[in-house]
């Protein structure tokens, strides 16, 4: 989902995707593994935390059938069907009609290591007779699957997923690794596909009779770690490839745009981070999502001193699925019109603090004239 969308510019390395579900046949879909929704989410977080909603929204933005074509034509997946090409759940979440093989997955991920070049798997290179004469040659078949900048960004993102995300159990000392976990409903199938600068490896675990895998962690990550650590025992650590055409930019984690001063003043803490992006698809506009209301805070000391502090909130109002308001989205509390009643809906509203022990009054509302429009398939590419 993410690699082809990066490759054609649908998203960039700083994009923000809405971790919020949709309605499918009247039901809330998709669910995340942790049954939580964070709202506006930076791409690197969406991948590291395996957020299904973000994968679905990205796939819809890129095109379900386009995703199918990319996997079949560029990355050598041979078992995908026409039904897969028409279903976003299949293409975004891996719910394929016939499934894929670990060989296909390992070969596809190897393209990220090889600067975007896909090489068809082969079990032998050549056959020689007793005299060393070559009687059968099995030449490599390679094609350019994606830009080298796309592969480099994916490497960067999947390193974070393996280091701080769901793939942390696959780590072993002395080697750079990148990778991604996977699972099916009720953990009846588990996956880990990862790679180093030397090798790629895909691991699947499951029972013959489709039973739930009960484990404290992901058994595939543990297998990957044991196998790959042995293979790399005598290999020197090295980083993944670098290439021209990349740039690092300071961006807002809530808008995907270039960071402003207000992004660092978010009431949750600074929302500024550095993203790796392709130079020809980098964000150019400064964040319009953050606005900074000024609070006069009564310190309630004996001399009646008053201190003025500044914070910022998201200049955006979340649309909720009608009839499903019980779905709590974490970022809604940081937006204008947040559910906790902290912020007014209109520019002329008085701001009121939530009930409780406090000495704070709000001096004035933020400007809401530039509030972005709300769309169900919210993806910001900067």
Indicate where each model-derived feature is located:
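Generic structural signal for hydrophobic residues
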Residues: 1, 67-68, 223, 227-228
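Short, glycine/proline-biased beta-turn/loop segments that scaffold the active-site neighborhood
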Residues: 1-40, 75, 119-133
């Amino acid at each position: 989902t993410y690699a082809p969308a990066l490759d054609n510019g649908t998203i960039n390395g700083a994009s923000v995707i809405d971790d919020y579900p949709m309605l499918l046949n009247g039901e809330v879909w998709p669910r995340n593994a942790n049954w939580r929704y964070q709202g506006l989410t930076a791409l690197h977080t969406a991948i590291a935390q395996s957020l299904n909603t973000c994968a679905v929204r990205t796939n819809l933005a890129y095109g379900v059938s386009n995703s199918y074509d990319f996997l079949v034509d560029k990355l050598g997946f041979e078992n995908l069907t026409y039904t897969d090409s028409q279903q976003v759940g299949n293409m975004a979440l891996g719910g394929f009609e016939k499934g894929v093989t670990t060989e296909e997955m390992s070969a596809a991920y190897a393209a990220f290591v090889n600067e975007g070049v896909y090489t068809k798997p082969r079990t032998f290179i050549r056959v020689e007779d007793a005299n060393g004469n070559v009687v059968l040659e099995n030449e490599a078949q390679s094609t350019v699957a994606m830009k080298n900048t796309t592969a480099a960004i994916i490497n960067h993102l999947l390193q974070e997923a393996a280091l701080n995300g769901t793939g942390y159990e696959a780590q072993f000392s002395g080697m750079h690794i990148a990778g991604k976990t996977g699972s099916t409903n009720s953990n009846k199938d588990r996956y880990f596909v990862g790679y180093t600068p030397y090798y790629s490896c895909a691991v699947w675990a499951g029972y013959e009779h489709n039973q739930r895998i009960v484990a404290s962690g992901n058994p595939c990550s543990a297998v990957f770690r044991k196998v790959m650590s042995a293979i790399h025992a005598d290999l020197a650590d090295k980083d993944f490839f670098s290439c021209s055409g990349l740039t690092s930019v300071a961006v807002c984690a809530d808008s995907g745009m270039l960071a402003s001063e207000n992004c660092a003043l978010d009431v949750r803490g600074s929302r500024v981070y550095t993203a790796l992006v392709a130079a020809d698809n980098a964000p150019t506009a400064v964040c319009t999502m953050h606005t900074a209301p000024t609070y006069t805070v009564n310190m309630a000391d004996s001399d009646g001193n008053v201190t003025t502090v500044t914070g910022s909130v998201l200049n955006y109002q979340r649309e909720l699925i009608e009839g499903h308001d019980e779905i709590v989205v974490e970022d809604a509390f940081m937006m204008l019109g947040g559910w906790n009643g902290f912020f007014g809906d209109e520019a002329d509203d008085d701001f009121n603090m939530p009930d409780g022990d406090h000495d704070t009054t709000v001096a004035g509302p933020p400007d809401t004239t530039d509030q972005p429009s709300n769309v169900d398939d919210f993806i910001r590419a900067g």
